[in-house]
Amino acid sequence: MAKLWGGRFTKGTDKAVEDFTSSIAFDARMYAEDIAGSKAHATMLAKQNIISDADRDAIVAGLTKIKGQIDKGEFSFSVALEDIHMNIEKRLTDDIGEAGGRLHTGRSRNDQCAVDLHMYVRKAVVEMGELIVDMQKALIETAEKYSDVIMPGYTHLQRAQPVLFGHHMMAYFSMLERDFDRLLMVFKHADIMPLGAGALAGSTYGIDQTYTQKLLGFSRIYENSMDAVSDRDYVVEFLSFSSLVMMHLSRLSEELILWSSNEFNFIELDDAHCTGSSIMPQKKNPDVCELVRGKTGRTYGHLLGLLTTLKGLPLTYNKDMQEDKEGIFDAIDTVRFALSINAAMIRGMKVNGAHMKAVLDDDFSNATDMADYLAKKGVPFREAHEIVGNAVHHCIEKGCVLLDLSVEDFKAISPYFDADILDAISIEACVAGRNNYSGTAPECVERQRNNGKQIIANEEIQIDNWKEIISKVQE
């Protein structure tokens, strides 16, 4: 098949080279962005009298027809044509003739590819934002549903202090809030228009980039044409966002795996979100959680891979940069899956609050509160720490816990203990006493939930703002 760039060559491209360099297998998903960019470019060319209105109309109509064919799965892509840009241009030229050959006037595949990816990433940011909000809503709903459940909080994966289950859920809410904030920067940098930069140095045709910017809904234009075609920072930033949100979901998945085990028995995942064993009939496996955990490393790989690819590239475009797309496309798909399925799992799981409380009642998670009790009576905290440590050791040897001791036992340990000690170190009191701003007391967690709802409302306003920007694309 003749190449659209083949004039300089005397030989056809080796089939192995075609297969190796082709990107149509993955960049075909940018067809809508490519067509929108081409329509805007053709419209601008006609406005500037670079092509005729008749050619513009033929190009726009032809591109609309092609989009309809791709939408319906009726378009046959060719590896020999390398990428989505050349596949569409070749079909357009076949369909409308000479006018199709004028579409690429004043444009390079370098700025064409860049503008496609910018528009694609903008859409992805909106989708990711909506998925984060839904996940945050699931966390708040679950925190409210189990608002009175107290569970062990852990350090070093050992029981440490009692916390409200809702407090634990809201910790993940805060992580996702930061993830949403990262999308603000990704969108800001994706919302810069590179079209008009040409191959690297701009255009000699008297194009109107400001007009094209308006047609494609970009907030601004790249100041420097060389930067425009070589910049992939916004892709790196999206992959960084993806890596962090997947890390947060992986930590949650790890906890869901542990909590759903017989050893913990804190939660039960819904049957719809688990799988079984081909040999062990009793098994109910948290495969989804395990896959989220596993796919996190894959997302990290995309980030590191692109950083490594870009680090040695001279300005401006190099074919290495084709490697930006598979990674970000896969990251988008992976994060989409992970956020949506985690939201469903959180909403569907059952929390075994009674067992969590029983675990706390049979443990030493209230030891810190016992030391705090002494410190508030004037005992230096380090001395109080030593006294309580000895008491815990005594209980371990006797096969009991602190709550099993009598008031007389406590007074034998230290004269500073009074009759109120058992109330002071009850699990409920341990939680209620931590009523500082970020603490786990019920009123604090309620405030966190209420603040979270306002955060979600603000995030939804931001998503609407993004949608408004994208809606300006004149397709």
Give residue spans per PLM region.
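Charged, flexible cofactor/metal-binding loops and thiol motifs
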Residues: 118-125, 129, 144, 152, ...
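A helix-coil-helix interface module used to build multimeric assemblies
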Residues: 1-202, 207-211, 275-276, 287, ...
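Generic, well-ordered alpha-helical scaffold segments in large soluble proteins
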Residues: 41, 62-69, 91, 95, ...
